[in-house]
């Protein structure tokens, strides 16, 4: 299964230890989404549509109401990239 460049970018950040933090409104609907790297930087470019696409593919999951992290399925989908650290 191919994934888009934007999905690839998000999954790569999550594979390195980042997370997706979700804030919900009073009705329980998602109000705000932010992707945070392992260093604490907020990554732009994550919108609700992209979040739903990645979640639908089973690449991310939340446990016990915590932030969304990459799953084993997500690790299989993500292609390795060189990291300039």
Curated annotation (Swiss-Prot):
Pfam families in the cross-refs: YjhX_toxin
InterPro entries: YjhX_toxin
Recorded family membership: Belongs to the UPF0386 family.
UniProt name for this protein: UPF0386 protein Meso_1721
Organism: Chelativorans sp. (strain BNC1)
Source species taxonomy: Bacteria, Pseudomonadati, Pseudomonadota, Alphaproteobacteria, Hyphomicrobiales
